[in-house]
């Protein structure tokens, strides 16, 4: 059974019997005969040989789903046995955006590896959409997201929160003389998290240019909703995919942008920061797990580093 699944999966990947046979180190006639026996047992074809390249039939797609489920079960069983044999070891594949991998995870991973030095970490970086697809395919052990529409599809645990601030170049700041701006030092000290920190209306910045993230990014969706709340269409100077890049372009004076408070790690005088009067500025991120997948000891230890979900990198006040 295991061998026939391997044969069918290789033909599916290569979409060609000859190439698949070469990869499997058997002859093409032997491979064709083995698959024909499976098709005879099922009473229907797995591959449509009339197409070029060959393709799966409906029965073939059902069989492929079965193969992939079996492969995942095998991997989970091996992981469980590995956990039993080596409780102080393990491997975890983590998926994250550049923002998450560069600004959130280093501190967490350092703490994890200090306590469990034999744990192996594999860090994958991709867009949120790609990470979601990899999680659905069970290619990741864990990833992170904050959109309610997204997180409901997966088992999840509260991980950390951040606060969205508006970063405005000093030279174009319309409120620069009103003593409501926050400096980078104040943000680093957590001043914006205190209850008496003043909030301002986003409408105050309706006349200055904005740098926005591309559609599909959570911060893009939030910014659109905040502009709607404020009742104006932003003067968009530039759109891009990376939050960190937007932050540096704002610091260069090109336009205002929304940033996470966790990005601000060093003093600077190029930008003023504002806490916008909107409930959308607080983001709760969750650790998301694949459905129906055994959670390894290593993954559980990693998730436990975030505690109750109130983990806030860099702020100790």
Annotate each predicted stretch with a short phrase.
Residues 5, 41-42, 63-85, 313:
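Alpha-helical linker/hinge and terminal dimerization helices associated
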Residues 127-131, 136-139, 146, 216-271:
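Hydrophobic hinge/microswitch elements
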Residues 9-30:
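Short helix-boundary/capping micro-motifs
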Residues 89-152, 240:
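Central regulatory/effector-binding core of bacterial HTH transcription factors
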Residues 39-58:
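A short LG(V/I)-centered, amphipathic sequence patch enriched
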Residues 170, 264, 271-316:
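A late-sequence structural motif
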Residues 115, 127-207, 264-267, 279-281:
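Acidic, Gly/Pro-rich loop/turn segments at junctions of secondary structure
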């Amino acid at each position: 059974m295991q061998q026939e699944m391997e044969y069918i999966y290789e033909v599916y990947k290569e979409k060609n019997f000859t190439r698949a046979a070469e990869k499997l180190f058997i002859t093409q006639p032997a491979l064709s005969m083995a698959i024909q026996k499976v098709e005879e047992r099922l009473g229907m074809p797995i591959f449509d040989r009339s197409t070029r390249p060959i393709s799966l039939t409906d029965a073939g797609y059902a069989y492929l789903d079965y193969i992939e489920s079996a492969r995942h079960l095998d991997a989970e069983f091996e992981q469980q046995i590995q956990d039993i044999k080596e409780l102080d070891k393990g491997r975890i594949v983590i998926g994250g955006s550049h923002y998450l991998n560069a600004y959130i995870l280093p501190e967490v991973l350092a703490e994890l590896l200090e306590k469990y030095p034999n744990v192996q970490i594999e860090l994958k970086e991709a867009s949120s959409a790609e990470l979601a697809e990899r999680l659905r395919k069970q290619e990741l052990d864990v990833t992170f997201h904050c959109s309610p529409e997204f997180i409901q599809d997966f088992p999840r645990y509260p991980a950390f929160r951040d606060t969205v601030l508006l970063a405005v170049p000093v030279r174009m700041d319309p409120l620069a003389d009103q003593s409501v701006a926050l400096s980078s030092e104040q943000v680093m000290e957590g001043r914006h998290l205190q209850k008496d920190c003043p909030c301002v209306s986003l409408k105050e910045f309706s006349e200055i240019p904005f740098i926005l993230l591309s559609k599909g990014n959570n911060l893009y969706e939030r910014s659109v909703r905040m502009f709607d709340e404020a009742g104006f269409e932003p003067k968009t100077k530039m759109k891009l995919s990376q939050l960190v890049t937007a932050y540096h372009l704002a610091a260069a004076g090109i336009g205002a942008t929304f940033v996470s408070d966790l990005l601000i790690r060093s003093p600077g005088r190029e930008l003023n920061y504002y806490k916008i009067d909107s409930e959308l500025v607080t983001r709760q991120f969750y650790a998301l797990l694949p459905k129906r997948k055994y959670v390894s000891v290593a993954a559980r230890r990693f998730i436990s580093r975030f505690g109750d979900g109130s983990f806030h990198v860099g702020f100790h006040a």
